[in-house]
Amino acid sequence: MSRELTLQERLDGEAGPDPLRQAVKKAVAALAQAAIDISDLTCRGALAGITGEAQGRNTDGDVQKDLDVRADQIIRDALGALPIAVLASEEMAELDILNPGAPISVAFDPLDGSSNINTNISVGTIFSIMPTPPDASAAFTQPGSAQLAAGFVVYGPQTSLILTLGQGVDIFTLDRVERVFKLTGSMMQIPADATEFAINTSNRRHWDLPVRAYIDECLMGADGPSGKNFNMRWIGSLVAEAFRILVRGGIFLYPGDARDGYEDGRLRLVYEAHPMAFIIEQAGGGASTGRKRILDIVPGSLHQRVPLIMGSIKNVRRLEDMHTGPNVALEANAPLFGHRGLFRV
């Protein structure tokens, strides 16, 4: 049986002598070490003093948990001495400009899904690595297509690191005995078509017509236009949803809706949508707002929110067609939601 390649070995093989790739290698290695430390905390839970209690709100108005703060500091400590121009954390209001002449800049969500801590559901870390432009303060005003690398970590039954360096997607699993990440999935490919969707259906009444139409079509199953029966999944953890899509396909939707503050969804472009879109596209999937490719969007602000639809390419394209074509009219005729259906609207 062959020995599993470690993350460090994979990074060494990819970097070569190029200074930019060397900087990316060092940043990813440091983020991986930080993830091991965060994994230790999440695994110990209350034994490590992790209560899941609110510590206030971050600058964007979201409740900030105790582990959010600790995870943020762990990552900052890991990256602080590296050749990095700018750090941007979802937990902080402003950029942290470290070394304006350094070749890369790193954005991260230190603990995505922290509201799940008390219920023992998977949480994670998400990161994006950008080239530093001449004006370092503009590092995160570049489109997502400029990313050099992106990844996320799932702290679940296993701790898994999902990584793209722009040439496919690999999965590394934490070996807790040796305390290193080892390659367990290489060149991941998302099935082009799948029969699982993930969305919080309790918000249906607030959705735009195209989203309603698409979900109604899924619920119609084999009796509807798709001719297939779908299953619904909703974990409420972006990293867990993305991992499931990577290994077995499906579509994830966090759309904008009619509620105050939800017009553009709730996910951040820089910290969540851009890195997830890069990973999903590198695995053969699609990522869109419904009307625009996520990786084409240029951030207008550091904490900008954006609707996110991602997953199997045919499923994503179908929903995009519903945003731009005549199929929205189908929504009113969906049998499950029509005047003779199970649910009246």
Swiss-Prot record:
Q: Please provide the record's keywords in A-Z order.
A: Carbohydrate metabolism, Cytoplasm, Hydrolase, Magnesium, Metal-binding
GO cellular component labels: cytosol
User: EC number(s) in its UniProt entry?
Assistant: 3.1.3.11
- Give binding positions for Mg(2+) 1: E90, D109, L111
Q: What subcellular compartments does it reside in?
A: Cytoplasm
Q: What is its main location?
A: cytoplasm
What processes in GO biological process is this protein linked to?
fructose 1,6-bisphosphate metabolic process; fructose 6-phosphate metabolic process; fructose metabolic process; gluconeogenesis; sucrose biosynthetic process
| InterPro entries per the UniProt record, alphabetical | FBPase_C_dom (IPR044015), FBPase_class-1 (IPR000146), FBPase_N (IPR033391), FBPtase (IPR028343), Fructose_bisphosphatase_AS (IPR020548)
Question: What family does the entry list?
Answer: Belongs to the FBPase class 1 family.
Which proteins does it associate with, and in what oligomeric form? Homotetramer.
Write down what this protein is called. Answer: Fructose-1,6-bisphosphatase class 1 1
Specify the species: Nitrobacter hamburgensis (strain DSM 10229 / NCIMB 13809 / X14)
